[in-house]
């Protein structure tokens, strides 16, 4: 191929990608804005902190059925694990 053809193709691809004409991947971390990413981290860490503070409830029940175990249900609901 001629170098001019390659250059034109390269410029065309760059223009299309900058104007959002090319399809983007859905569900990619690249499409997530920074605020949503930080909210997800905050939610995960707050659930982990809550679980750590109620560790005795979680320790006494099986993790798989934590939302149906009466002993751990209050802790799980307060931590937002059984939404």
UniProtKB/Swiss-Prot annotation:
<feature type="propeptide">
    <location>
        <begin position="22"/>
        <end position="48"/>
    </location>
</feature>
<keyword id="KW-0732">Signal</keyword>
<feature type="signal peptide">
    <location>
        <begin position="1"/>
        <end position="21"/>
    </location>
</feature>
<keyword id="KW-1015">Disulfide bond</keyword>
<feature type="disulfide bond">
    <location>
        <begin position="50"/>
        <end position="82"/>
    </location>
</feature>
<keyword id="KW-0527">Neuropeptide</keyword>
<comment type="function">
    <text>Probable neuropeptide.</text>
</comment>
<feature type="disulfide bond">
    <location>
        <begin position="67"/>
        <end position="79"/>
    </location>
</feature>
<feature type="domain" description="ShKT">
    <location>
        <begin position="50"/>
        <end position="83"/>
    </location>
</feature>
<keyword id="KW-0165">Cleavage on pair of basic residues</keyword>
<protein>
    <recommendedName>
        <fullName>Protein ShK-like4</fullName>
    </recommendedName>
</protein>
<feature type="disulfide bond">
    <location>
        <begin position="57"/>
        <end position="75"/>
    </location>
</feature>
<dbReference type="GO" id="GO:0007218">
    <property type="term" value="P:neuropeptide signaling pathway"/>
</dbReference>
């Amino acid at each position: 191929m001629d170098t001019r053809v390659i250059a034109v193709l390269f410029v065309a691809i760059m223009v299309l990608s900058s104007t959002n004409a090319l399809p983007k991947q859905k569900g990619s971390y690249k499409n997530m804005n920074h605020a949503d990413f930080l909210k997800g981290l905050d939610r995960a860490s707050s659930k982990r902190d809550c679980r750590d503070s109620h560790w005795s409830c979680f320790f006494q029940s099986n993790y798989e059925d934590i939302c149906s175990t009466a002993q751990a249900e209050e802790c799980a609901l307060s931590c937002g694990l059984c939404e």
